[in-house]
């Protein structure tokens, strides 16, 4: 699979596999996991990249949601599951619990 990227609006970067849209991430995540434009990647590399992109998206969503109001762990995870996978949502929630921004009991 040939991976190419294209700058989007703001800080977005659009990723394409074999010329077809595949995912969107932000510049920071892309720079942390950079793969040169036109690189030939296998399915394993693509899946690893998607895991990192989804985790970063989950962290960003947590920050956004918690900046608006307090959430219980269950509420936040339920909200995250609307836009990211279960593993990424749980890892992001765990990270915010460790950092002291989220508590099981209020």
Regions found by a protein language model. Name each.
Residues 1-106:
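An alpha-helical, amphipathic repeat domain used for nucleic-acid recognition
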